Amino acid sequence: MLNIEERYDPKRNTVTEVTVYYSDIKKVKVAHAKAEFTDVVKRDMFDVEISGGAVVTMEVKTLDLQVNCTGRSLLTLSGDTKYLTMRVSTSNMNGAKLYTVASIVDVSHNAEVRINVSERLEAITSTDAKLLYKGSPAILRDHTSLFGGYIRNID
């Protein structure tokens, strides 16, 4: 595991850039930082955890992708995955260019998620969260809680 941390200094006005080279990556956790992945992440199974206002952009090619995005973060995903399991809270996840076959999505606390799904979508929204999806899944299981939110097809 590689952990990169930097101490906060309010007097400093420069940005630190770090380049990480990898050959095999299973999981990414980003907090309080901006991260851009220049290469496509290719794995059978891959996990992404974003928090603390992080801004992350990546392209994936996976069979199974698990995403957890919290804390006013912004995650932009593109590419394709067969199975997507996602939990997003108080954040935005733009997966307009992420193509999935089957997705399980839980969106809460004013979060907004955009995805493409072709066959199966299981979705839950609560506390004013929004799920916008493209595609015509044959199986659609959706639930909006008492505290609002919505799930909409935007094709």
Could you say what each language-model-derived stretch is?
Residues 75-155:
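Short, surface-exposed interaction patches in beta-rich subdomains
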Residues 1-51, 64-68, 78, 82-85, ...:
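Acidic (Asp/Glu) and glycine-rich low-complexity loops/linkers
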